[in-house]
A protein has these predicted regions:
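Solvent-exposed hydroxyl-ligand-binding patches built from regularly spaced Ser/Thr
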Residues: 27-175
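Sec-dependent N-terminal signal peptides of Gram-positive bacterial secreted proteins and lipoproteins
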Residues: 2-28
Length: 175
């Protein structure tokens, strides 16, 4: 009788033990911007900017941005033939976007926005790079929603996220 019970109890104890180990090993591996006390950096393509109940948020697709030697290395790993043909990452940068998950991030009311190029006048002939130009969040929203002259959704953006809220948006210039 004792052998029959131990035959059932032992597998249950082993399963319980394994589930505790598995649960313990996954605790802390999840990145949750809301629980982190330090700022996080993410590079994204912004898909939409929305306002709901007076709060502004963006929906974005996180990417991996590489430049210089890192771009050449990743490009060669992912496209050896292309890298051999042209000798390195095109234009000195490389974007990896293996996951098309969209995430919505709230934006702080006092978030800073830094641009490299955008439509200042409504004339395509006037487009010119102005490195690290600070604009207001309202200007950014206005410019982002204008797509007739220059589509800002085609640029990557570096976000600083503090306590789950975007505090800084920096446009990455691409040639």
């Amino acid at each position: 009788m004792f052998k029959k019970k131990s035959a059932y109890v032992l597998p249950v104890v082993v399963l319980l033990f394994l589930s505790l180990i598995t649960t313990a090993s996954t605790v802390g591996t999840r990145v949750d911007a809301q629980d982190s006390g330090k700022p996080q950096q993410q590079t994204v393509y912004i898909h939409t900017i929305q306002s709901e109940n007076g709060k502004i948020s963006i929906t974005a697709d996180e990417i991996n941005w590489y430049q210089g030697a890192d771009a050449d290395r990743v490009f060669a790993e992912r496209d050896p033939e292309g890298a051999a043909e042209i000798g390195g990452a095109p234009d000195g940068y490389y974007v990896v976007n293996d996951v098309d998950t969209l995430t919505t991030y709230p934006i702080a009311d006092n978030a800073t926005v830094t641009m490299q190029i955008y439509d200042h006048t409504g004339n395509i002939e006037d487009l010119d790079i102005q490195w690290n130009e600070a604009i207001t969040l309202e200007q950014f929203i206005d410019q982002f929603n204008k797509t007739d002259i220059f589509d800002l959704s085609q640029f990557p953006y570096h976000l600083t996220i503090q306590d789950g809220v975007i505090t800084s948006i920096v446009q990455q210039y691409i040639p």
